Amino acid sequence: AGLSQFLVKVSNLIVDCAEIQRLDIHPLLASGNEFTALDVTLDIAPFIGDRESRLAIRPYPLHLEEWVEMKNGERALFRPILPEDEPLLRAFISQVTKEDLYYRYFSEINEFTHDDLANMTQIDYDREMAIVAVRRSEEGEEILGVTRAISDPDNVDAEFAVLVRSDLKGLGLGRRLLEKLIGYTRDHGLSRLNGITMPNNRGMVTLARKLGFDVDIQLDEGIVSLSLSLISTDKQE
């Protein structure tokens, strides 16, 4: 445990300080949970550009955390999903009706496996983003809604989806989550946000229209295609 904590602290140092070019700790003496660095070499230089682009794995985007007030006056924390959210996500899904799950996944799903939930919570923040609305209480945390975008290999377009707990509709969560996702994907440099839903999912169709999506109802296919350009008018001109 001691070594793990030491490595985490070194990793945090590298993540936070883009100016570090080289860090050499040698020798390092360990005695139980105590460590003594006898010699440290640190090379630094000015860094210009995306500070996170130099990292093999993009770290947790703490800057995306935001407290949002719902229509009922309660506050929810909007934040990127974490690997440890798996049990919270399982509990959230159990409070979504089969009808709403069918609208989201286009099939009847009886149960999500551990692998399914792991894939939903253990994500590469550079290629995928899932933002959850979390309510905190004395009993702990609970997920109220989630929105997700998965980009293509070129990081140009992204497929999106949004799901809110069935007993919490009407609080503006879906809209606020999707607005948050639109802002993130636009800032991330993506060009277009795409999604599909069903014609009888009127709530999603109405929300998409309000947020400026192009809505293409394809009754023959039984789907509604949703598409939003993320490129500002100034850039297009």
Stretches with model-predicted labels:
Residues 45-237:
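Long, contiguous binding/interaction regions
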